[in-house]
């Protein structure tokens, strides 16, 4: 069982293919809630980090009808699934999905209006340094949204850290401190108390 759930970190093999499909519908409610905190700019250039099965990319393309969306994931299975899920938008030139590592984002400075990370920062190494990478590729004034299904305040959720190697569940306060240390400003914590959901938004300083 632990081996199967390891696919939440990096989907591989048949279990990984099943996991990315499950993620698309399983994470839909928390992702829908998280997207309510996004900036509204119809022509935004958006990056979804840890894009998984691609459902959030599709939702972002609807939210920004004149924009473009890029998905990045370090799992080849996730890249294939997200590409298939968004094949029409890719054919239209509105979407691109690439394999990569959040520790070295393959984009030029000041490139994206909005960057999102749904159910993924649990697995990011060197979080403060990775947040600096996110800051680098954001445009001045651009926003970064983190959305997690666990707000780090429920001890029962900690059991997943023992099941899934390399997983860390963060509180809103911990993420806020790391984001500010990386150079972000206007950091805000949003919670859905009944569900223990967490969303943190932050901005790159204006030039």
Sequence positions of predicted segments:
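N-terminal, positively charged/glycine-rich alpha-helical extensions of SAM-dependent methyltransferases
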Residues: 1-15
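C-terminal alpha-helical "lid/dimerization" subdomain adjacent to the S-adenosyl-L-methionine
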Residues: 14-24, 143-201
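Conserved alpha-helix/loop element of class I SAM-dependent methyltransferases that forms part
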Residues: 25-44, 59
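A generic alpha-to-beta junction signature in SAM-dependent methyltransferases
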Residues: 38-40, 63-64, 89, 138
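Class I SAM-dependent methyltransferase SAM/SAH-binding core
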Residues: 45-104
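A short SAM/SAH-binding and catalytic strip from SAM-dependent methyltransferases
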Residues: 114-126
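A short glycine-rich, Lys/Arg-flanked "PGG" loop and its adjoining helix->strand segment in the class I
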Residues: 128-140
């Amino acid at each position: 069982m632990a081996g199967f759930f390891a696919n939440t970190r990096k989907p591989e093999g048949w279990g990984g293919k099943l996991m990315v499909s499950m993620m698309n519908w399983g994470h839909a409610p928390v992702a829908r809630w998280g997207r309510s905190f996004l900036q509204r700019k119809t022509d935004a250039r958006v990056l979804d980090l840890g894009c998984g099965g691609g459902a959030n990319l599709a939702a972002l393309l609807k939210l920004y009808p004149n924009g473009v969306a890029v998905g990045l994931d370090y799992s080849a299975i996730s890249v294939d699934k997200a590409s298939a899920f968004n094949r029409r938008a890719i054919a239209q030139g509105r979407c691109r999905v690439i394999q990569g590592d959040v520790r070295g984002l393959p984009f030029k400075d000041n490139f994206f209006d909005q960057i999102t990370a749904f159910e993924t920062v649990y697995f990011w190494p060197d979080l403060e340094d990775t947040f600096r990478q996110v800051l680098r590729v954001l445009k001045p004034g651009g926003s970064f949204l983190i959305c997690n299904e666990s707000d780090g305040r429920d001890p029962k959720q900690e059991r997943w850290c023992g099941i899934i190697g390399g997983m860390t569940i963060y509180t809103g306060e911990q993420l806020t401190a790391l984001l500010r240390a990386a150079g972000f400003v206007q950091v805000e914590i949003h919670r859905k108390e009944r569900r223990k959901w967490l969303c943190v938004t932050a901005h790159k300083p204006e030039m």
